[in-house]
Design a protein with these regions (language model features):
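Phosphate/adenylate-binding glycine loop and adjacent helical scaffold
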Residues: 1-75
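C-terminal accessory module of base-excision DNA glycosylases/AP lyases that mediates lesion recognition
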Residues: 1-19, 24-28, 73-86, 90-91, ...
């Protein structure tokens, strides 16, 4: 991948974070968001490398990046900081294809009302799963990393049930104005991933 393409992808990833923070976020201006993003060592994950990233390394990196954002900007709680990290990585790592081998399999979906709504609809018959994913239902209520990890643990179960990557739970995302339909698909709606029955 050319340096130019990587620059375009990461610049766009920063803009998607800024865009995702427009509604309800305690930090919304580019003069605050972009410096915060520059303080995160995304390069460690996104730089071309043959070294595969493993779950333990990613989990430690994610926890540290989230906590550092919170320490750097007092208005951020863990929920908003994690959303910033996750939106950036979704755009750069999953959509943009940047990153070390194995990164896409580890990425977390951005947690927000649209994802909570889609999870609730898709897993209405799984109260034990929803007890994890919906331990809180507002981003600002994710005040500590343990709560965030509980939500992600439930999301992992949901992804396993759907037979998809954790980040691919985004297929369930429901926009405020669009309801449970494909996310601005340019093609005919594809069937959702079939759920495995246990």
């Amino acid at each position: 991948m050319s340096d130019c393409r990587a620059q375009i992808v990461t610049t766009y990833a920063g803009w998607t974070v800024l865009s995702a923070l427009r509604s309800g976020a305690p930090v919304k201006s580019s003069s605050r968001v972009y410096p915060l993003l520059r303080s995160v060592d995304f390069h460690r994950l996104l730089a071309p490398s043959r070294a595969r990233i493993m779950l333990g390394e990613f989990a430690e990196w994610h926890r540290d990046a989230t906590r550092r954002l919170c320490a750097r900007e007092r208005a951020l709680c863990v929920g908003w900081a994690a959303k910033m990290v996750n939106v950036y990585l979704k755009t750069a790592g999953y959509v943009g294809g940047l990153g070390r081998p194995g990164l896409a399999q580890l990425l977390h979906p951005p947690i927000d009302a649209g994802l909570w709504s889609g999870l609730k609809r898709e897993f209405a018959d799984r109260p034990e799963l929803l007890a994890k994913t919906h331990v809180v239902t507002q981003i600002k209520a994710i005040r500590d990393y343990a709560t965030y990890e509980t939500i992600i643990a439930g999301c992992r179960e949901a992804a396993d049930d759907l037979g998809c990557l954790l980040i691919e739970l985004e297929q369930l995302w429901e926009g405020a104005d669009y309801g449970p339909q494909p996310n601005f698909s340019f093609q005919r709606a594809a069937p959702r991933v079939a759920r495995l029955r246990r």
